[in-house]
């Protein structure tokens, strides 16, 4: 009798293991969909996110309603080849564009060093660029101007800014470079990693979605910058 009971218990345990294995999610059929659902999302600005932004990217005089902004989560490949989690705040009008673009960049393993809210750098653009941070919304004026930047509307994004600086050339031949540490990457005839040009995938995807590239401007060259009107 004891032997029969033991066999019954062993049989039950084996069947339970089989049932648990059969109930595990398929790594091939569901993992990609789950990743897309969790990480490539656009949501209204939550209280927690807004607290991070207040007094930084979302300044006291900000004229852009919070309701027009969206919090985006993406995945991307870092310079070390590892998958990273990124976050952006943008205008709702370009949220779907950014989700689609970053999905394609992720599939292609396009390297982006980091994607953090600029609030992590106290909304200081120079510091954010120095750390090669890809960012979007920041209520501020164009450097050296009284005009509001497209970043103020959440309709512009800077990609790998250290390697793709903003370059302003003067008539006397001198130039201003933002970030300052990006001066080594102002000669765009050279070949180097992470350079955005017309052959670059990021350029091609943003253009496909109707964005303008700062590298095509005449008055200055903002190689990191994409905006959509």
Enumerate the language-model features and the residues they cover.
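Sec/Tat signal peptide C-region and signal peptidase I cleavage site
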Residues: 14-15
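A generic secondary-structure signal marking the coil-to-beta-strand transition
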Residues: 70-72, 133, 155
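Active-site-adjacent substructure of cysteine-protease-like catalytic cores
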Residues: 125-152
